[in-house]
């Protein structure tokens, strides 16, 4: 329990090793399990469900910092994917005393067309949120599974099969509807977040890695902006085959 809020989390791995803190998108914490199984042989890891009490990005991240304190974790290595990559950047900016290094994969930064497009939906988003709340959970999960087919179109057959199984498993839990709506709200709140500056991450110079898939769901221009921001900080920028889902659900 942190600030009176019950937290569901998994904390395991190699005792005494550096701790990896995972940030994910769409409230799909399950995506990190293949990574935890592999990295847990050398590192400690922490995966947690984002709390429902706030959709404000800074408050969400400060809550994560309080969770670390409650677990007596002083330093972490950040790994963020999809929208979770933006959360990792916010954590690195707000809590530099807690960060050893940062890895970002198949993600972007606040200075992106993705976020600018969200700003254009100021009037339509509240209506969409209302509809999401009214639609029965089973129907909403079927729609999510149908939409996931588009995410998987550019993946290899092996990754498509893995991705389908992953989405089906997540959607089989009808309680995921509330997590999905919460995630939708949190992403919408990023629309007004201030742009990051190079100085925000100067302390991590040479300790940042950015992994970019060849066929990401995010625009190449957004990938380039992310690479430009961290390339100035001597980050290792790596490009690889595959798409958004393949990078996330497979731990390679």
Residue ranges and their predicted role:
Residues 113-115, 137-200:
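Conserved alpha/beta-hydrolase catalytic His-Asp/Glu region
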Residues 217-222:
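Conserved alpha/beta-hydrolase "acid-adjacent" motif
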Residues 5-54:
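Conserved HGGG/HGGXW glycine-rich cap/lid loop of the alpha/beta-hydrolase fold
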Residues 46-81:
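Active-site loop/oxyanion-hole signature of alpha/beta-hydrolase fold enzymes
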Residues 80, 84, 88:
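Gly/Ala-rich beta-loop-alpha elbow adjacent to hydrolase catalytic centers
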Residues 93, 102-134:
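Flexible "cap/lid" loop of the alpha/beta hydrolase fold
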Residues 242-251:
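Catalytic histidine-centered segment of alpha/beta-hydrolase-like enzymes
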Residues 204, 210-212:
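Short beta-strand/loop motif that positions the catalytic acidic residue
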